[in-house]
Amino acid sequence: MFFMEITLDQLLASREERASFQKELLKGYPGKTLVCLTVIMPGKVKRNLQSLVVAQAAVTALVSAFGDSMLKFRLRDLPTGYEAYLVTPLSNEEAKKETCRIEDTHPLGRLFDLDVIDADGVPMSRESVGLSPRKCLVCDNEARYCMRNRTHTMAELTAKIDEMIESYVR
């Protein structure tokens, strides 16, 4: 395990590569649903002991929820973070509801970024299945509002993540 800082260019390149990988999976499984996991880990170090704990918890939750219906599962350990992909015959809507249930009920679920990718490579929104947007890790505002406005300091975010993980591993 290494704790290497990544650059913005690396992060942006990893997003492009992830989108390309998702399109390849979708092409290989036409008519099926793709679920993609990334770990929410603010800062320049995306791969550390905390992100490993979160990724393992998320993978366990995904396998528990989708295990019998998984057609393919792939885990990737990259300098830009852990990623997992699963293909299921469930509808996009069924899969999105299940991933939202995991995010909303698992003790570390707020640190899971579980996307359901449609046939065009576009992630489905929570609102598309009648759910409200994700809440901020620190306060009760919408997460996207706090992210866009940089409402919380890195120290506040890190403290909250530390607290969540510490509580989970106890």
Language-model region placement:
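Short cationic amphipathic helices and targeting signals
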Residues: 82-90
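Long, contiguous binding/interaction regions
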Residues: 2-67, 77-79, 94-170
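Short beta-strand elements
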Residues: 69-73
